[in-house]
Amino acid sequence: MTSSTPPSASPPPPGTTASPAPVRLKPLRSLTARGKGETHRVASPLELFFDLCFVVAIAQAGIQLVHAVAESHAGEGILNYAMVFFAIWWAWMNFTWFASAYDNDDVLYRIVTLVQIAGVLVLAAGISRAFEDHEFVAVWLGYAIMRFALSWQWLRVAWSAEGAERTMALRYAAGVLICQIGWLGLLILPEDGRAWLFLVMAPLEMCVPIYAEKDHPTSWHPHHIAERYGLFTIIVLGETIAAATVAVKSGIDENDALGELLPIAVGGLLIVFAAWWIYFVVPIHGHLRSNRQAFLWGYGHYVVFASAAAIGAGLEVAVEQAVGEAHISTLAASAAVTLPTALYLLAVWILHARHFKVGLAQQLVLPVAALLVICSTFLGEWAVLAAGLVSALAVATGTTLTARLVARESRESPGQASSAVM
């Protein structure tokens, strides 16, 4: 890349339109804030590549959760999953919000982002040992690589900024590094102390942005943030479908168990389809108007992403139990699907849907659906199919209620569209 003026070119042939000359920028530029009202802001190819690499780590966490639950170690597996998933999600979230405010796409920014990607791949490589041997060296190292890279980005911001913005950037850089030192407890403390360390360090990590931005908020872009979260949700749901598909295929190929697996396959597909529908039924960027709203919404997505990925792990467990490879009961296997599904429905309702619903009937659709999904746990081999049908029925009910409301408002106020949603 260079900043020189390109040589003049011959005029285009008659009847054709000349392509615009590429914009030539310096390879190294100041890392300054982007405009919050910037038009046509969309996710960059680097951000999409970043997401795809992070899903590799999520897939590894899901695989280990399947093994733990299938071997009757659900409690230990869920705890390890929560800890590892927090590391993945928190590193992804910090990068996402930083990029929304400061992405200048210069050479150094790209290199540091690629270092963060390398970090999550190191973390992913250590997930199996964290679950099986309770050894967190690779997980800590991968997380440290990502956090040191992020701290460097904030120091670049501080170098270019002044006043309150510079103070904010320095607070971020220092907070990230201090928390990383705290996570050394994963390598030092006995196994019984790691859960307590997590309960202390996770809230401390989440306090860093709140403290850093108390005097000067970053200029994150609402539409860009909503798109980034939406794209990551799609990728996680895609990984859920991929994992469940592989499990069903293996069950059919190795055990010729199509009859036993068909209800799980159909129910799982309905659950994932409904999960996509209720998340994207209405754009959320209009709700993100302040840091307070953004923090609650962004932090709440830990539950959305973790439960969405856990649905795929649960479907794998249900398949293994159906073909006799899991050492758990049908009830436990069913709960592995229904509980994360219900949690996802509730989380999306709290973070998204309730802000746009009109009337008690609309507000109750997703909470009631979550309750019915939990009740379907007790339906034996039909539990997953029942949960899928309930999820699909929730979508249909919400859509019907919205259509009726729109029709009524159209009669009362012609020309005005309703904002109510499923």
Feature roles, as predicted:
Residues 62-77, 100, 129:
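Short, hydrophobic transmembrane alpha-helix segments
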